[in-house]
Regions:
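Domain-level signature for soluble enzymes in the chorismate/prephenate branch of the shikimate pathway
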Residues: 1-286
Length: 286
């Protein structure tokens, strides 16, 4: 072995030791933050801050290490420390056609956080509602379907569930993930907060006489940029259609926009509210 190669390996070993020291120091600091959050009754999980952190790291990143690897490394760090802080658990929807959502969930939550499969969409939402799990990973909405799972987020009383994150998280960017079978949404009782670059989901329950075109037009008149509009029908509610609006930007649950929309749709509207959203992560497609 050449002296040069040996010297390089010695340097790498020293770097590994430094990295490990910093990881241990980081974990200790995060634990201190967790304790302060508990004393102040603050939200333990902060997807908005995590998204800002990833954006900051990717903005300064250079060299041969793939950007996707940076995301995976820091997601693993966040997941591991979060488990130590709160004992988080995850359920992932899976049906007879397989489970494309499992790998996405594992990439986001990390290899340490306990995860289990569930074969019912409503059961996954119910597990969050009943505090049986911290997060549920569910299929991305379809443009038109019956009895969609996301309708369970409408008109809640004390549950306070919301969509918190979109998956895959910085894996290959949106260009290669437009197929809804390869995308997922995360539901939790943690609050969806602004990260400065977000999409919000608005829930609307409207009479069937209100067309999708009218919905989009009225939203546009009130400054809402619609990314997608998903609709759901139910045999139990034949006179109403539920709509899930994927809108650009952060919309607060108490935004005056919601009252304005209720007035626009008037008697045709049975529900109008924010049901969560997701922070954007920079594209990783090169």
């Amino acid at each position: 072995m050449s002296k040069t190669l040996s010297d390089i390996r010695v340097k790498i070993d020293k770097i590994d030791d430094k990295v490990h020291d910093l990881l241990m120091e980081r974990a200790s600091l995060v634990s201190s933050i967790a304790e302060a959050k508990r004393k102040s009754n603050l939200q333990m999980v902060q997807p908005a801050r995590e998204a800002k952190m990833i954006r900051r790291l990717l903005a300064r990143h250079n060299g041969p290490l793939p950007r996707q690897a940076v995301v995976r490394i820091w997601r693993e760090l966040v997941g591991a420390v979060a488990l130590l802080q709160t004992g988080l658990t995850v359920v992932v929807f899976a049906d007879e056609h397989g489970n494309p959502h499992w790998d996405m969930a594992k990439d986001y939550f990390g290899s340490i956080v306990p995860m289990k499969k569930i074969n019912s969409r409503a059961g996954a939402v119910g597990a969050v509602r009943n505090d049986e799990t911290s997060f549920a990973v569910l299929p991305w909405p379809e443009l038109d379907q019956n009895d969609a799972w996301w309708v369970h987020l409408f008109d809640q009383h004390s549950e306070k569930m919301s969509i918190l994150c979109a998956l895959p998280y910085g894996s290959h960017g949106r260009k290669s993930t437009q197929n809804p079978t390869h995308r997922s949404l995360v539901v939790s009782k943690f609050e969806f907060l602004p990260s400065d670059d977000d999409c919000t989901f608005l829930g609307l329950d409207l009479r069937v006489s209100v067309s999708r075109t009218r919905v989009v037009d009225r939203l546009a008149e009130h400054g809402v940029t619609v990314v997608n509009l998903y609709s759901s029908k139910s045999s139990a509610r034949p006179d109403y259609n539920a709509h899930l609006v994927e809108a650009r930007g952060y919309i607060a649950p108490d935004s005056p926009l919601l009252d304005a929309l209720r007035q626009v749709f008037d008697a045709d509207c049975r529900y109008c509210g924010v049901v969560g959203g997701y922070p954007a992560v920079p594209e990783l497609d090169e």
